């Protein structure tokens, strides 16, 4: 008579399968009970429902009565009229700008000049905004000018720290004296030229964003500083850089900019750390020399 031997590991595996099957059955039963929980307990009386629930009715295919629909408070149903994220114009505009940025990088890698790429891109963005964000009716140009004036007055009335003003005034006065009168206000009459100037300034600053420049330190040493340490957006840096005498004219001509002078100017106006570390008198002379050298070329 032959004997049948059973491997103990097979027995243990079979017991484990039985335990898993029992747990699965228990889980299914609990799910069924949870799904049928609304069938248990006391029945709900229709008369005891809240007042808003009494307005609910089954759709029989007929159009609802406008009088009854008007009684419902608009504030309770504002969420129903909110657009999805995909339908939000600002979300679509953000996606469009991301695609534009990718396209600019590709064109620059292909060897095209940034100034040419930027001028074309600006026109495309303006066209996109004009088509997808039309001006709302009922607002005249007078309202826009009034709002703009209000914002400008608000900016002018914002107090500035006296310490920042006193430390940066010396360098700015020296730079003004060195370069003569400010650049001509050609940008006020030619918007495309103004955009091209900003693009040229942004391009040159971006190329040397992490490059460190030498400045005189208060400890009789050398202070190394770069645009990246400003912790500012490139657009804000460009706006401040346009205030440096002669920079706008140099950018319009496509000449190289005195980036160390620009960095010192922007840092004096926006970085308290730079103001505390730099020697302002020596910095004024350095900025003056840089402006003289670049504007005389």
UniProtKB/Swiss-Prot annotation:
* UniProt motif (Nuclear localization signal) ranges: 211-214
Its taxonomic path starts at: Viruses, Riboviria, Orthornavirae, Negarnaviricota, Haploviricotina
Keyword field contains Chaperone: yes
Similarity field = Belongs to the lyssavirus protein P family.
Q: Does the keyword Ribonucleoprotein apply?
A: no
Instruction: Tell me the segments the record calls region DYNLL1 and DYNLL2 binding.
Output: 138-172
Explain the post-translational modification: Phosphorylated by host PKC and by an unknown kinase.
Q: What does this protein do?
A: Non catalytic polymerase cofactor and regulatory protein that plays a role in viral transcription and replication. Stabilizes the RNA polymerase L to the N-RNA template and binds the soluble protein N, preventing it from encapsidating non-genomic RNA. Also inhibits host IFN-alpha and IFN-beta signaling by binding and retaining phosphorylated STAT1 in the cytoplasm or by inhibiting the DNA binding of STAT1 in the nucleus. Might be involved, through interaction with host dynein, in intracellular microtubule-dependent virus transport of incoming virus from the synapse toward the cell body.
GO cellular component terms listed in the entry, alphabetical order: host cell; host cell cytoplasm; host cell nucleus; virion component
Q: What is this protein called?
A: Phosphoprotein
Quote the Gene3D superfamilies the UniProt record gives: 6.10.140.1560, Phosphoprotein, C-terminal domain (1.20.120.820)
Domain of life, per lineage: Viruses
Organism listed in the record: Rabies virus (strain ERA) (RABV)
Q: Which residues carry this modification: Phosphoserine?
A: 63, 162, 210, 271
